[in-house]
């Protein structure tokens, strides 16, 4: 980017751990609404998993020195659905680990919930955080099974992380989605230049985000509190991190949250969602 001059990259990424959290049995947690395209949940999980794997392969091609670890945390999928997930991973010949999570292991750590789906959601998220605590990767990307990625998404996120954190001289949080709720109030934001597009600072996030192991450890209490019980909003303690740290999201979106068309947490603006959806169809 010639007009911007040279940015000296002092924060180089050596390794990335991707923790993909899936539950193929619940259509939309905490809602009765239908997702865009109104397909069974397994279809979203498969296409979103496919998109993430394609993005991993592109990253390995363009950034061969960056080590990538891929883990799937599965929350009680049926044998049939779990086989579909495994078959897709095997088709891509990508190294991975699938962890079959049993939510009963957290019955002493999470407050009892009237809704078992809520308990399961908290438990699988806590499992992701527990896995991350043991991980030694430079960056950790927590990603849910209803985020549809572009092939170039991970490369852009990693390059932007290096650029912005080098300029900021500190760690940052990178969210892949341009959520509608970012535009629903008069909140001021800063516009930044990433590797390929503009980004904006944010004060709210959901449970799909990229964070350094260093920052994750720094705010470990917030991550633990997030899963102790159902908060309002759900991400209350994640958002508290953004009160003292810089978080950014892309303009335009690098991953689409495949929710209901009217959800403020969902479909990003100015994206050909149908095209991206079809590009990630699983070919039998």
Locate each region found by the language model:
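Short loop->beta transition adjacent to catalytic acidic/histidine clusters or analogous donor-positioning motifs
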Residues: 16, 55-71
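Short beta-strand/loop segment that forms part of the nucleotide-sugar
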Residues: 64-77, 100-103
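Active-site-proximal specificity loops/subdomain of glycosyltransferases
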Residues: 33, 78-137
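A short, conserved beta-strand element in the Rossmann-like catalytic core
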Residues: 146-148
């Amino acid at each position: 980017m010639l007009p911007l001059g040279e940015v000296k990259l002092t924060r180089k990424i050596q390794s990335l751990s991707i923790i993909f959290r899936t539950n193929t049995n619940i259509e939309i947690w905490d809602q009765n609404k239908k997702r865009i395209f109104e397909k069974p949940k397994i279809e979203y999980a498969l296409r979103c998993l496919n998109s993430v794997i394609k993005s991993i392969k592109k990253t390995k091609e363009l950034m061969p020195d960056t080590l990538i670890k891929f883990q799937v945390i599965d929350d009680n999928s049926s044998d049939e659905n779990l086989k579909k997930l495994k078959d897709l991973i095997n088709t891509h010949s990508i190294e991975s680990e699938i962890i079959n999570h049993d939510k009963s292991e957290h019955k002493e750590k999470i407050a009892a919930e009237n809704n078992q789906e809520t308990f399961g959601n908290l438990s699988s998220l806590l499992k992701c955080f527990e896995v991350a605590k043991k991980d030694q990767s430079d960056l950790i990307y927590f990603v849910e099974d209803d985020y549809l990625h572009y092939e170039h998404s991970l490369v852009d996120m990693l390059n932007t992380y290096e650029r912005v954190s080098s300029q900021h001289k500190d760690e940052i949080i990178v969210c892949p989605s341009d959520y509608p709720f970012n535009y629903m109030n008069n909140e001021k934001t800063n516009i930044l230049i990433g590797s390929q597009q503009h980004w904006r600072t944010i004060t709210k996030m959901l449970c799909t985000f990229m964070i350094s192991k260093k920052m994750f450890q720094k705010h470990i209490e917030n991550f633990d509190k997030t899963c102790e019980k159902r908060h309002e909003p759900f991400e209350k303690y994640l958002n508290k991190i953004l009160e003292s740290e810089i978080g950014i999201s892309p303009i335009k979106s690098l991953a689409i949250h495949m929710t209901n068309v009217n959800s403020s947490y969902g479909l990003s603006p100015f994206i050909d969602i149908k095209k991206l959806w079809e590009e990630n169809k699983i070919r039998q």
